[in-house]
Amino acid sequence: MEERELLHTDGLSVGYHGRELIKEIGISLKMGEIVTLIGPNGAGKSTILKTIAKQLQEIRGSVYVENINLSELPEKELAKKMSIVFTERITPELMTVADVVAMGRYPYTGGLGILTPKDEAVVAQCMEQIRI
């Protein structure tokens, strides 16, 4: 059985203020894959991730999540399909691992962001799946 493609890019170029910093990025992620993005400080790792997460506008090309172009996907729908936790935004001494995992449920909560028992069960299930 062919694995479902979750995310791919097509001719993606990223940068700031219309200036291309990294060109023709090719990414293809399938269900169940674990991928790392490795490089020295300033190489553009965060710029690539922020562009994929729709926090930065792509300079050229497209990003697709489940074969839907991100430019056509509302932010709330994207948040249900993808989350990225940047380490500089976390204050780990004030958060448990469960707190960080629970951040992925917030797009499914109401305006107050309060987790329901169902949300808490999903968090527990996710933690069990990755054995933490």
What are these regions (language model features)?
Residues 61-69, 78:
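Conserved ABC transporter NBD signature motif
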Residues 117-132:
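Conserved ABC ATPase "signature" region
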Residues 7, 22-24:
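Conserved structural motif at the start of ABC-family nucleotide-binding domains
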Residues 19-20, 76:
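Short coil-to-beta microelement around the adenine-binding A-loop and adjacent beta1/P-loop entry
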Residues 72, 88-102, 107-114:
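Conserved catalytic motifs of ABC-family nucleotide-binding domains
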Residues 38-40:
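The feature captures the beta-strand-to-loop junction immediately N-terminal to the Walker
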Residues 53:
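Helix-to-loop junction immediately C-terminal to a conserved catalytic motif
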